[in-house]
């Protein structure tokens, strides 16, 4: 039997009609289709699962047909099952789906932004021709969940967006954002995530209202977002009325927008253009960190995956252009009990604790590295298991001059030296467009805002010859070209520059 409430019955139909009649008299509220409580994110795993389910249904139909046609006694799984529908659907999903895209790999920021992109287009979504202003517009529920700045210009404006810095998806695909509760005008240390519907029950204030630091008098009016008269509004209330406060001033914008210093003083349209243009910067040959930053540069570079980070704390034992070796701290090497019959296998292992002889005196002290001589002494004078650990050395390989999806150069350079002590998750090698583990997309050059004989009219700029001579803005681009040599009827094709009846000047020979 179906559980109660799983199917429509007469009472449901009556309830629907009653609500519609009430709405015609102005009683009740209509659901807002653009409210993030009514919109959920379908992740790539869910999209693939739907395609896989379709292919399994096709395969089931083929199996049933074969079972009815062929003799049951002679059937084998190989005869019945044809995996071609599954392979075809998965290939089609990754190869030609509207939501399966070639990763934007111009620089680390473009890669990170592409992975955090949200799209209202695609199968089961909107069509850009049919999408009106309402669905493209910024909604109050986007606050802290979807960036109001970062979106493309043109026909996709508002349909393709970017996750805000602190936004997170819950188990059901709804976007959540973190808040701290306010008690007597002071913010708690505990951080809780709320979706758009949960947030409506509270009065929320942004981080930069300074409530978090407890510096605002309780009677003072502060900016906040509240649910008033059936819709969310940005208004002012006293500190006593505030229930929740944001955890960061960057919470409402995306990673790319948070890299712009003094963003609050920018015009929104220009901020949008600046955010999008950062993703088009090619990695330079000589990088330089920005003089004025926002503090997000380090996190953006590390989270993009282009820099190399150490997995465990330890000491650097070897560095060259292609690899780095780090000896782990002993605490991060697994301890094992070694019985006497396996003592001979312990060459190179380190003792975790002192080992006593049969007489009770200390035979070997802690941190002794075992060799064949010490193992002989152990076999003669010790009969119990010992605790040892193998000090491990991790090797990190660097990517050298490889080609990205957009033909930019991916080259990692070590930034540690032999003997350096490193912590876990510390940057040990720079990638493209990074400097000492920080994102470095451009150069700090002296700029003059002045007319120059009309050469810089409109968007034109005049640059110094030194920028070219000193490789200030030089970048490396790697292109791959393929050519096929086929077997033809007259004979196999040959790739050569010795052209018959052609002079040396044709092929550039001197």
Where are the model-predicted features located?
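Extended, domain-scale alpha-helical bundle/helix-rich regions
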Residues: 1-138, 147-160, 170, 176-316, ...
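A structural signal for short beta-strand/turn segments enriched in small hydrophobics and glycine
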Residues: 314, 370, 416-428, 449
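Short histidine-centered loop motifs in beta-beta connectors
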Residues: 397-423, 510
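Short hydrophobic beta/alpha edge segments that flank linear recognition/processing sites
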Residues: 154, 323-324, 371, 422-437
